[in-house]
Swiss-Prot record:
The keyword Ribosomal protein applies. It comes from the Bacteria. Transmembrane segments: none annotated. CDD domains: RPS2. Belongs to the universal ribosomal protein uS2 family. The keyword Ribonucleoprotein applies. One of its GO terms (cellular component) is cytosolic small ribosomal subunit. This is Small ribosomal subunit protein uS2. NCBIfam families: rpsB_bact (TIGR01011).
Length: 245
């Protein structure tokens, strides 16, 4: 079973919250105190909650369920994309498009357009077009890939969301709540834990903290998949295969 320890969290700075004047009273029970006007998260509370979330993700992965990783702010995007790709999971790292879950039918049509453009780019169709038309399609492809590239192989709605910074990704959480999709979220001292089923109280800004959350979650997915698929490679191949639209 995937586990993190106190040392890992201290090293990553998970305990450093936001300035005390920005605190959200709903996070009060997870705050240990303050130092230099910065709230300190009580890691003795975070530890079991983090590990509960990891166990939940591992169980989901064992049942071949899909976990969608969401982190669109600058400090999170690259790490989210790298770790999601490592464990063969869908992700959103650039911008959450309204309706990504609640209007999935429209999103599915955009994914089909993305796939069509990818095919055209590979089979030489672009080369046969006028320079202007080829440039327009290339830009369209780039834009769609940036927004939807991480979910193009998802093949349907996810079974859970893992979110870095619940305030920044509030639209995603609201959509998941409407559809009854469980939400796992990193919740800092200035944020509201509302709508989050598995709360991980902690720093949602520091790169090292984000790396710890994402690496641990990706490891949990891989561990769960290995229990049924016999290896990460098997799952990575499954995830890379184009989903039926």
């Amino acid at each position: 079973m995937s586990q993190v320890n106190m040392r890992d969290m201290l090293k990553a700075g998970v305990h450093f919250g936001h300035q005390t004047r920005y605190w959200n009273p709903k996070m009060g029970k997870y705050i240990f105190g303050a130092r230099n006007k910065i709230h300190i998260v009580n890691l003795e509370k975070t530890l079991p909650m983090f590990n509960d979330a990891l166990s939940f993700v591992e169980r989901l992965a064992q049942g071949k369920n899909k976990i969608l990783f969401v982190g669109t702010k600058r400090s999170a995007g690259k790490i989210v994309a790298e770790q999601a790709a490592r464990c063969g999971s869908p992700y959103v790292d650039h911008r959450w498009l309204g309706g990504m879950l609640t209007n999935y039918k429209t999103i599915r049509a955009s994914i089909k357009r993305l796939r069509d453009l990818e095919t055209q780019a590979e089979d030489g169709t672009f080369a046969k077009l006028t320079k202007k038309e080829a440039l327009m399609r290339s830009r369209d492809l780039e834009k769609l890939d940036r927004s939807l590239g991480g979910i193009k192989d998802m093949g349907g709605l996810p079974d859970a969301l893992f979110v870095i910074d619940v305030d920044h990704e509030r639209i995603a959480i609201t959509e998941a709540n409407k559809l009854g999709i469980p939400v796992i979220g990193v919740v800092d001292t200035n944020s509201s834990p509302e709508g989050v089923d598995y709360i991980i109280p902690g720093n949602d800004d520091a790169i090292r903290a984000i790396e710890l959350y994402m690496t641990s979650m990706a490891d949990a997915v891989i561990r769960g998949r290995n229990n049924v698929a016999g290896g990460t490679e098997v799952y990575a191949e499954e995830a890379a295969a184009p989903a039926a639209e």
